């Protein structure tokens, strides 16, 4: 038997803001809020499905350097250019990680600067 990823915990300054952003990016819903201000989001069917939930945990610790982990998202219901425009309108911004301009993906940052990549459609909707 093996393990699978059930949730990703992301330390952040404003859990509600990031939860709202990522709910719109992934078409997730808020599944719960903890007393400490942490917000868990996930698929509409709730915890335990194929996709992991995301937990945005409040932190006042300063972040130093590049994070060793980032999220890749796949377009499911529109072309990559249309999705890029949608993500930018939601508050994402381009992130420069040394791209050449020939990549098939776009590197972006969420409202707190966490990098993520928008890939071309590779997964079915």
What kind of feature is each model-predicted range?
Residues 1-19, 69, 75, 122-125:
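N-terminal beta-strand motif that seeds the catalytic metal site of vicinal oxygen chelate
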Residues 3, 7, 32-33, 40-43, ...:
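Vicinal oxygen chelate
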Residues 14-15, 79, 105:
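Residue-level preference for nonpolar/small residues embedded in alpha-helices
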Residues 15-29, 87-91:
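Amphipathic alpha-helical segments
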Residues 36, 49-51, 64-70:
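Short connector loops at helix/strand junctions that flank enzyme active sites
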Residues 58-63:
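Short, flexible, solvent-exposed loop/turn segments with mixed acidic/basic and small polar residues
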Residues 64-85:
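Mid-chain, well-packed structural core segment of small domains
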